[in-house]
UniProtKB/Swiss-Prot annotation:
Ribosomal protein among keywords: no
Signal peptide annotation: 1-21
Protein name, entry field: U-scoloptoxin(11)-Sm6a
Modification after translation: Contains 8 disulfide bonds.
Gene Ontology MF terms in the entry: toxin activity
Subcellular location: Secreted
Main location: secreted
Keyword Secreted: yes
Family classification: Belongs to the scoloptoxin-11 family.
Keywords: Disulfide bond, Secreted, Signal, Toxin
Reported tissue expression: Expressed by the venom gland.
Record's GO cellular component terms: extracellular region
Length: 227
């Protein structure tokens, strides 16, 4: 199951092949039209993703593209008309949230589209664009529907479409979530919901296992089971 939060974190850090097993690997995005190594946003693309840390309520901002035309992308948690909140997550837009997004996702509806551009020969990552189509419930995750590819000149364009799927109830040996901590970034990767009477811990000392990966930032991932 694709987990959107961590995917965006490691894209922003410059490497999508994460400690949690995402399949994409890339160098830092480069696009001369943008700033900070990010491409210029396409119309209606999300410009940033925020997650509120369950440990200390700190907000981690993850910019994905650069706004143009005098627009700016807020990296603060707020309700400014350009933000869409889903539980502990907030998606940011360069302008007002598109009206077409403001509804709950149906079971088979396309919920999110991710577009990757890379150099056809070198496989170097060039750009990423994310598009919300509807609102996923907080207890849901994104499941891939399809992944078409096409070539445009010297670029390979990969489009990945996702729908919402309700998180299952954790079994006795299931990982309920993983806590990825690197530098000042702390991101939760949810995998299932704990059964009644149990909770998924956030204290790193409660982890049953740890993994350490180096991207452009050192990341330690703490793997948790329900307690």
């Amino acid at each position: 199951m694709f987990q959107f939060c961590l995917f965006l974190v490691l894209l922003t850090l410059g490497r999508i092949n994460s400690a949690l097993g995402s399949n994409h690997e890339s160098d830092a995005a480069e696009n001369r039209e943008g700033s900070g190594g990010l491409p210029v946003c396409r119309e209606n693309a999300i410009c940033a993703f925020l997650q509120q840390n369950a440990i200390d309520s700190k907000v981690t901002p993850l910019p994905t593209c650069t706004c143009s035309g005098g627009n700016t992308c807020s990296e603060s948690w707020n309700e400014d008309g350009k933000s869409l909140t889903m539980g502990s997550k907030q998606f940011k837009f360069c302008s007002n949230v598109p009206e077409s997004v403001k509804h709950n996702c149906d079971a088979e509806e396309k919920a999110f589209t991710a577009i990757f551009e890379e150099d056809k020969e070198t496989k170097k990552h060039l750009a990423y664009y994310g598009f919300l189509h509807c609102i996923c419930p907080e207890d849901s995750d994104y499941v891939e529907i399809d992944k078409p590819e096409k070539e445009e000149g010297d670029k390979l364009i990969r489009t990945e479409n996702f729908r919402c799927e309700k998180l299952k109830t954790c079994g006795a040996n299931d990982r309920c979530h993983s806590l990825a901590i690197g530098g000042d970034r702390q991101i939760v990767y949810r995998e299932c919901n704990c059964p009644e009477g149990k909770q998924c811990p956030f204290d790193p000392e409660s982890a049953y296992d740890t993994e350490h990966k180096v991207t452009t930032t050192d990341y330690t991932t703490y793997l948790m089971r329900c307690q």
